[in-house]
From Swiss-Prot:
InterPro entries: Pre_C2HC_dom. This is Nucleic-acid-binding protein from mobile element jockey. The gene is gag. GO terms for molecular function: zinc ion binding. Residues 390-444 are annotated as: Three zinc-finger-like regions. It comes from Drosophila melanogaster (Fruit fly). Residues 189-203 have a biased composition (Acidic residues).
Length: 568
């Protein structure tokens, strides 16, 4: 009997009975006692009798040679997950071991560990399908009819196994006397609740963007200049971000550019470089950049707190509000102090630049037409087209907010921040070109070269000039319209008429050309007179400047004489 049992029973039979026991949803001891009691009611002398265990796609039936039968109902889908085609094995039923009882009395594992159930570790980019295995809770479902799809139809569902007719007959007969039907219903409800909970958790994570399936932009490069020991840099990045989350490229200027795989690796690399006191610079992440809009149609003296509250009522978080100023020479305000007088000719404009926090619906803020009692217009702020220069290290291409290099003065190129209070030198020295001007001077040759590269290229489509060329049009002055078609005209009349028309055309051209020449001459004469008047005014201006310089020199000499004569 032992040999026949070893040959007829599959190697994974214990695992299958273990899974069927877990579907029942009860402890091993309770299930054993119930099965033992059911067997004892029908026949108390079942010990040592050979039994036959049949596993169908809908229920598990344990029957002996007598009339005693015990049936454990499971769902159709669970049977498809657990069972293979029906097999029969012979064993011995005793009062201590049941065929559906595992060899170990371990605690039941969660239902998420059953086969054919999606796992978060295996499928991190997919959520559970809520439409699968949806049943009414608390009601045991009857066997579903088998629907065979057509060969031409493409389906992703798993093919169901055909049911055995004999097993279906025995199942229908055993439904009336089944003592474990409630266990089957409770197991189905338990599995459905766990599946719904997992689906809700994954759906909420996907909506929040906190899972791995959330989309993110490509992080910018981290620029590290003057790297003398690249091995140490790689070792530090490997320990902090991981060797597979970054790569390095060297530019033609010798700057090491570190490209990371995701924003988390980017932030980790920046923190590590800051710990090492490394000099570097980078740009802001796209997810952290504010959404900048322009608010028009609102009074300039409206408090910023009121505007912030109005945007908060619409569901947007305001990060910063800025009201620009413009020059107003008509309304000059003079503020006189003890030793100096300053002129304030800038007034606030009736518009605000507002930085909003990034969000999924932040673009909907452009549809706002009313803030409080004001009828407003919200537009996307235009991007600044001028060349960006760092006010910390004076290098072009990044800002001081994301620069970790040593400060350099924009006036004397000293090792300090730009400021006349800290700068003791009177000589200007540009750090970029070495010229005698400040680093922010518009005439810097390095700045001019960088600005040329920023000019946008023409986006007009390339057209074929030969195909777009138009034929030359005749002047309207020499054009004579054709006459209506007439009959009974000889060839001599036509030739005579053509000769007359050519003579008339030559006469008209001779009369028109002198007129055009006279008009051009008059225009040139007017332009020449204007240029002469401008030259005269420029000469007068130069003389006035020269006299002013001479007077300034005389004034300085007079001051020096007065200083020398002052008694000490």
């Amino acid at each position: 009997m032992e040999n026949s049992f070893a040959q007829s029973r599959p190697s994974n039979g214990c695992d299958k009975f273990e899974k069927m026991r877990k579907v029942a949803g009860v402890e091993p001891g309770e299930l054993r006692s119930q099965l033992r009691a059911s067997c004892a009611v029908v026949s108390p002398n079942l010990e040592g009798m050979p039994t036959q265990s049949a596993v169908s796609s809908l229920m598990v039936t344990i029957s002996s040679n007598t009339n005693a039968s015990v049936t454990c109902t499971i769902s159709n889908v669970q049977a498809n997950m657990i069972c293979t085609p029906t097999y029969t094995d012979c064993t011995t039923v005793t009062t201590s071991i049941c065929p559906t009882t595992p060899y170990d009395n371990g605690l039941p594992t969660p239902l998420s560990s059953l086969p054919n159930k999606p796992s978060k570790a295996n499928c991190p980019f997919q959520a559970h399908d809520r439409t699968v295995n949806r049943k009414r809770k608390g009601v045991s479902q009857p066997p579903l009819p088998i629907l065979t799809p057509s060969p031409s139809r493409k389906t992703k569902r798993q093919a169901t196994m055909p049911l055995n007719e004999e097993a279906s007959t025995s199942t229908a007969a055993a439904l009336n006397n089944n003592r474990f039907a409630l266990l089957s219903a409770e197991a189905e409800n338990m599995e459905q609740d766990v599946s719904d909970a997992d689906s809700d958790i994954e759906d909420s994570a996907a909506r929040d963007g906190g899972g791995q399936s959330a989309k993110y932009s490509k992080p910018p490069a981290i620029c590290v200049p003057s790297v003398s020991d690249p091995v140490t840099l790689e070792r530090a990045l490997n320990l902090s971000t991981g060797s597979s989350n970054y790569y390095i490229r060297i530019s033609r200027f010798g700057v090491s550019r570190i490209y990371t795989a995701n924003p988390d690796a980017f932030r980790t690399a920046v923190k590590e470089l800051n710990k090492l006191n490394c000099q570097f610079w980078h740009h802001q992440l796209k997810e952290e950049k504010p959404y900048r809009v322009v608010l028009k149609g609102i009074h300039a003296n409206v408090p910023s707190s009121q505007i912030e509250q109005a945007f908060s009522d619409h569901g947007y978080e305001v990060l910063n509000i800025y009201c620009p100023r413009k020059s107003d020479w008509k309304n000059i305000q003079v503020n006189e102090d003890d030793n100096e007088a300053t002129k304030n000719f800038k007034t606030r404009q009736n518009l605000f630049y507002i930085n909003l926090k990034q969000g999924p619906n932040v673009k909907e803020s452009l549809k706002i037409t009313r803030l409080g009692r004001y009828r407003v217009t919200v537009e996307r702020a235009t991007r600044r087209k001028e060349l960006l220069q760092c006010q910390r290290c004076q290098i072009f291409g990044h800002s001081k907010n994301y620069c970790a290099q040593d400060p350099i003065c924009g006036k004397c190129s000293g090792p300090h921040m730009t400021g006349f209070a800290l700068c003791i030198s009177d000589v200007c020295l540009c750090i970029n070109c070495g010229g005698d001007h400040v680093s922010t001077d518009k005439s810097c040759p390095v700045r001019a070269e960088k600005a040329k590269k920023l000019k946008p290229r023409s986006r007009l489509p390339m057209t074929n000039n030969i195909a777009t060329l138009k034929p030359p049009q005749r002047s309207s002055s020499g054009y004579i319209p054709a006459e209506a078609l007439r009959t009974n005209i000889s060839y001599a009349d036509i030739a005579r008429r053509n000769t007359t028309q050519s003579r008339a055309r030559a006469t008209v051209q001779a009369e028109v050309i002198p007129t055009s020449d006279n008009s051009l001459n008059n225009k040139f004469m007017t332009l020449d007179n204007s240029i002469r008047a401008i030259n005269t005014r420029m000469d007068e201006l130069f003389k006035l400047i020269h006299e002013t310089v001479e007077a300034n020199k005389a004034f300085r000499e007079l001051v020096q004489v007065l200083i020398t004569r002052i008694p000490k």
